[in-house]
Amino acid sequence: KAIEDKEAEFGRIELQDVTTQWGVFALAGPKARDVLRDVINDPDPATVLSNKRFPWLSARQIELGMCPVNAIRVAYTGELGWELHHPMEMQNYLFDLLEKAGAKHGMKLVGARAQNWLRQEKSYRAFGTELGRDATPLEADLPRFVDLSKEFHGKAAMEALGVRVKCCTLLIDGPDDADPWGREAL
């Protein structure tokens, strides 16, 4: 739908689905930087992953071992971390490389449910759960990502709607083994 909306403005738009050509690993936790530092190919491995050279929400092309990676400095768990987007044909190689490097740092594998639980604990939103085309950034409680002092596409429409509902995080005292899915009824 978004592409159709923009075609009138920009002319012909061509879309190519490369979903099956790329994989992604999420590496997160207090020692994520140490794991990457052990396998990164860079003239200055000591500082290439520093907060100054690779700040939060930035993206860079790096090389881990022999694998080209589009790295994004973000972790859905709210911890120090990176998303490591890589060619699918390199996935097994990269997994083995990271697993070996991570072993000496105590790295453990976690699944999507654990990651989902951790992101909710940090009040991170997910498309298809808390977020969708029906909620504005202000309704999703994401004001830090919207600068209302600047002009942007959709600003007038968002302001005209106002805040009809608001997504918020509730802390519930209850059983220790209750894993949230998101959008639970209260």
Language-model segment annotations:
Residues 1-186:
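Conserved, structured C-terminal
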